[in-house]
């Protein structure tokens, strides 16, 4: 049976990200089953989805049996939560799992590991402090240069504890002085775990997106963040594509970083770029399809298809020229919150 004739399950078709993956595969004749957690999932209504599956249960409760019953050729996913679940299920699924294994996923979910790897390949990383039990937080806070950003090193590892304690998850917070910092840290004393404290980096958000296969990038794209929600830092609500002729040397470093991590598949290397000093500060690596994937799609960079084709069809992406600059006109994308 031809690989392209076997159905592919796309987990997380609720969002514009998942919808984009459904479109890219379905438009090329791949039978796509769009999975969502809501009856109003966007992917459900795409003409490129062969069928829709609504299931809110943990993947371990249904995916192995479903894979067998449907004869799936592959499973793809959008959210970090699904990536974590799939990493634990890889050996139980009789199909290709087009998401990172546990070791590679851990290298990007843990920001401390990511930043250490970046320093080894010559990428600037902001100074940071990971508070641990037994430290004198007040004394350490008094030594730090402000302002600072406070974010969890591995958000998925603490969400359960935060929820059990009735503490809201904060993607990022800022402190302007020691009192503000210690007040924020004290909020988490009850769970015995504290977020990472990171040097504030001026500039604007620059995302460099790559698809990696066997140590090389087969597709590249980049965007600049114009607006975020909330404005203090969060998801990209307005962004613009950037020609690959710009920030070219940093794109090479991004590829080197992902190669050093042994990365396979799509990833976004996210920087804060300061034009005043021409400094690129690494913020994190998103080891998954990112929020502005629709922008890449409309600029002709089809990362969903690239992920599928390289893994399932064995196409030589470099030979096809998909690692070259995107020829489509530059575009901007708005995400309505």
Sequence positions of predicted segments:
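Peripheral (often C-terminal) accessory segments that flank ATP-dependent C-N-forming ligase machineries
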Residues: 309-337
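C-terminal, active-site-flanking charged/polar segments
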Residues: 299-309
């Amino acid at each position: 049976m031809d690989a392209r004739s076997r159905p592919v399950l796309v987990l997380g078709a609720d969002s514009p990200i998942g919808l984009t993956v459904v479109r890219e595969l379905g438009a090329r004749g791949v039978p796509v089953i769009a999975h969502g957690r809501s009856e109003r999932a966007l992917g459900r209504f795409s003409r490129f989805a062969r069928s829709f599956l609504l299931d809110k249960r943990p993947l371990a409760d249904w995916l192995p049996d479903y894979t067998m019953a449907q004869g799936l050729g592959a499973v793809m996913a959008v959210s970090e939560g699904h990536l974590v679940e799939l990493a634990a299920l890889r050996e139980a699924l009789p199909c290709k799992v087009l998401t990172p294994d546990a070791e590679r996923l851990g290298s990007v979910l843990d920001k401390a590991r990511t930043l250490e790897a970046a320093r080894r390949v010559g990428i600037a990383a902001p100074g940071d402090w990971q508070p641990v039990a037994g430290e004198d937080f007040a004394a350490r806070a008094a030594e730090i240069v402000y302002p600072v950003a406070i974010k969890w090193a591995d958000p998925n590892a603490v969400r359960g504890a935060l929820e059990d304690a009735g503490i809201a998850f904060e993607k990022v917070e800022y402190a302007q002085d020691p009192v503000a910092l210690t007040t924020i840290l004290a909020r988490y004393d009850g769970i015995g775990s504290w977020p990472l404290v990171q040097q504030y980096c001026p500039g604007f958000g620059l995302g460099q997106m790559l698809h990696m296969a066997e140590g090389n990038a087969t597709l590249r794209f980049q965007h600049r963040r114009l607006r975020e929600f909330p404005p203090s830092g969060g998801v990209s609500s307005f962004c613009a594509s950037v020609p690959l002729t710009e920030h070219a040397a940093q794109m090479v470093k991004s590829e080197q970083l992902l190669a050093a991590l042994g990365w396979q598949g799509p990833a976004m290397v996210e920087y804060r770029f300061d034009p005043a000093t021409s400094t690129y500060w690494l913020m994190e690596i998103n080891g998954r399809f990112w929020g502005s994937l629709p922008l890449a799609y409309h600029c002709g960079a089809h990362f969903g298809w690239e992920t599928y084709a390289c893994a399932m069809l064995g196409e030589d992406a470099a030979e096809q020229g998909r690692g070259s600059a995107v020829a489509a006109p530059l575009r901007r994308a708005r995400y309505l919150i």
